Design a protein with these regions (language model features):
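Beta-strand-rich solenoid/repeat architectures in extracellular/passenger domains
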Residues: 1-13, 25-39, 51-63, 75, ...
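Glycine-rich beta-solenoid repeat tracts in large extracellular/virion proteins
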Residues: 16-23, 41-46, 65-72, 87-97, ...
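Short polybasic linear motifs
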Residues: 52, 93, 101, 122-124, ...
Length: 224
């Protein structure tokens, strides 16, 4: 299936804007997306090898989900800017192995929201845009699975007790080239809970007001 969404996609009341069941689906969403409450989903795909291109800006709030894919080998390209505001709100959610999420636009995650959430092994998140995370329970990129890779090329700004990158699983790799600013107690730039983690911090890091930059809970890890 191929769906071309050129107009604005506005979803509320627990509805789904686009709902596809089947493998190798493609959604080209050029018009932007607003998802305004719990159980509402902008784009949902159940199937393997899905491709979603979000070229417009996304605004997700009040427990809604922008893009959800349940299946392996999914690719989601968020080229526009994304704002996720509120507990249980999620910009992009993928449940499956070998997922790829490319966040080329800037992401702003507030008040308990999550920008990208992937549950599955061999996931890759490429954050080329800047990521701002503010508030308790807020997370920029969250991955649960082994062999996760996060490439943070844009700036990462974490405050108010949020987490920039949070990975649970073994053999995770984080390449942070964009620099990181972490302020306030309980705020964490990069957190990894698992064995054999590798963190490469090539950008400038500024840590203030009692915040830890990196928290790695692992029996083996190497930082460069």
């Amino acid at each position: 299936a191929v769906v071309n969404q050129d107009g604005e996609l506005d979803v509320s009341g627990g509805g789904h804007g686009i709902d596809i069941t089947g493998d190798s689906a493609t959604v080209d969403n050029k018009g932007g997306m607003t998802v305004a409450d719990a159980d509402s989903i902008g784009i949902q795909i159940d199937g393997d090898k899905a491709v979603v291109n979000n070229d417009g800006d996304n605004a997700i709030s009040n427990g809604g989900t922008g893009t959800q894919v349940n299946g392996d080998e999914a690719t989601v390209n968020n080229n526009g800017n994304t704002t996720v505001d509120g507990k249980d709100s999620t910009g992009t959610e993928i449940n499956g192995d070998k997922a790829i999420v490319n966040n080329d636009g800037d992401s702003t995650i507030l008040d308990g929201g999550t920008g990208t959430r992937i549950t599955g092994d061999d996931a890759t998140a490429n954050n080329s845009g800047n990521t701002t995370v503010d508030g308790q329970g807020s997370t920029g990129t969250e991955i649960a699975g082994n062999n996760a890779v996060v490439n943070q090329d844009g700036e990462l700004d974490v405050s108010g007790g949020g987490h920039g990158i949070d990975i649970t699983g073994d053999s995770a790799t984080v390449d942070n080239k964009g620099g990181m600013t972490v302020t306030d107690p309980d705020s964490i730039g990069i957190q990894i809970d698992g064995d054999k983690a590798v963190v490469n911090n090539d950008g400038d890091n500024a840590i203030s007001n009692g915040a830890p930059a990196r928290r790695l809970t692992a029996t083996k890890h190497r930082e460069q």
